[in-house]
């Protein structure tokens, strides 16, 4: 009799563990790692952009020395981005994340102004080094956009898992230390307003 009881318990345990593994008990840690990984890609692309800036500024400076204000803006924006401590805790701190996003937005705006200024200098636009840097910067901006999109998608998947069944159940029992992630906004406040174009 006890032999049958043992096999029933063993069978119940095997069935229960199979059901648990099939119904999403590991989704939250998996999605959390995807959020962290996708954020690392965003950081990598931001670093790539920051690494291009000194060469770009030096090249423009040689041709447009009297555009000192714009060059200073770009340099200061890069310094501001560099002064923000980026760590794994940035994802856990919405205020620090907001500061980081704002600094990156300011840097992006300063770079756009620099490229607009460069349009006034035909010799600069013909410089092969400048053209190569401009192309690399454009490619990096595209990579940043893709990395942001992937991060937003991973964050949404993670947050949805915490808010819906059965993820909500697993969250309350096993992963209560995992918090909802702050929604990432990759746009500036004025992005919703269409720019005026006049000819």
PLM feature segments, named:
Residues 2-199:
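A helix-centric hydrophobic-segment signal that preferentially recognizes long
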């Amino acid at each position: 009799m006890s032999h049958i009881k043992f096999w029933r318990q063993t069978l119940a345990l095997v069935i229960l563990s199979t059901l648990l593994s099939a119904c999403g008990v590991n989704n939250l840690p998996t999605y959390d790692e995807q959020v962290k990984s996708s954020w690392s890609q965003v950081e990598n692309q931001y670093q790539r952009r920051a690494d291009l800036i000194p060469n770009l500024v030096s090249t423009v400076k040689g041709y447009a020395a009297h555009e000192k204000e714009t060059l200073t803006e770009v340099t200061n924006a890069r310094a501001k981005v560099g002064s923000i401590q980026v760590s794994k805790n940035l994802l856990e701190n919405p205020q620090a994340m907001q500061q980081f996003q704002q600094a990156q937005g300011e840097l992006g705006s300063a770079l756009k102004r620099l490229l607009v200024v460069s349009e006034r200098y035909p010799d600069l636009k013909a410089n092969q080094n400048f053209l190569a840097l401009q192309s690399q910067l454009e490619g990096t901006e595209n990579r940043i956009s893709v990395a942001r999109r992937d991060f937003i998608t991973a964050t949404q998947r993670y947050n949805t898992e915490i808010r819906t069944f059965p993820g909500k159940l697993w969250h309350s029992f096993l992963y209560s230390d995992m918090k909802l992630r702050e929604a990432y906004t990759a746009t500036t406040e004025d992005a919703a307003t269409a720019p005026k174009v006049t000819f």
